[in-house]
Amino acid sequence: MESFAGKNVLITGATGLIGSNLAENLLKCKDVQITILARNENKVKSIFRNYLNRANFNYLIQDIKEPINSISKFDFIFHCAGSISPDTFNNYPVEVLNSNIKGIINCLEYIKRQGFGRIVLLSSATVYGNRKKNCITVNEKDTEYIDKTDSSSYIYSESKRMAEIIARAYYKQYLTDVIIARFSYVYGYARKCPNTAIFNFIKKALNGEDIILNNTVFERRDNIYITDAVSLICLAALNGISGEVYNISSNNYGNNYASIDEIAVHIVNAANKIKKTNARVKKK
């Protein structure tokens, strides 16, 4: 993190899993000026309570769908904002679209106006769509597979894909310095747990409740721990080539290729040992 010394950094979506961990890691370096952007001030004050009085820490309370309300000059904007909750995909799809598409446009316009600085767009491996069975490894060019338009996650993956297209358009037309980081499934510690499968499984298992899986067959996927994800995104931010895409994944380091049902079994076994409960994994 010392490589960011002397830099002014904005992190959108800073109360989320990746954004909050990224901010806390960068704040370990006192020579970095950090501004976080989030919608919920109470969450900000809770997650970052240890930094509120630090001279190198500021926060903006606003929705990323609106133009960024700041006069600061940022060397880096890490655009982490955007919902990852399946409930939000299903119930508020327009909000998902606006957050991903308007959000990146507002970041790009900010950097374009100030005339310097780099944007790191956090995208997702979901832009690769449903891969062939047992085809886990992909490179950055493998984007020809797409989901059906009635898929519940389509709104997320396609708005991420569109955000990438917009980012590259700004790079081509205005030479805006932007790189794209496509994350595999990120898991790990968060002060505020997101509403995703792994965190919900952990809650249920620790309460001694069974984990009910709605399907019987699950594809294996790459999973990456949050600390590794943060290290890699910082590496990409510092050394990545403008206009390029970088996969952020474990590449099966530590046997991190696993399906969601395999992960559920690991969670249940660990919780049963810790809490002396008898939770189980069941498939409908």
Predicted regions and their residues:
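C-terminal substrate-binding subdomain of Rossmann-fold SDR/epimerase-dehydratase oxidoreductases
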Residues: 58, 205-284
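N-terminal Rossmann NAD(P)H-binding glycine-rich loop of SDR-like oxidoreductase domains
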Residues: 9-29
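Short alpha-helix in the Rossmann-fold core of NAD(P)-dependent oxidoreductases
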Residues: 82, 92, 97-104, 111, ...
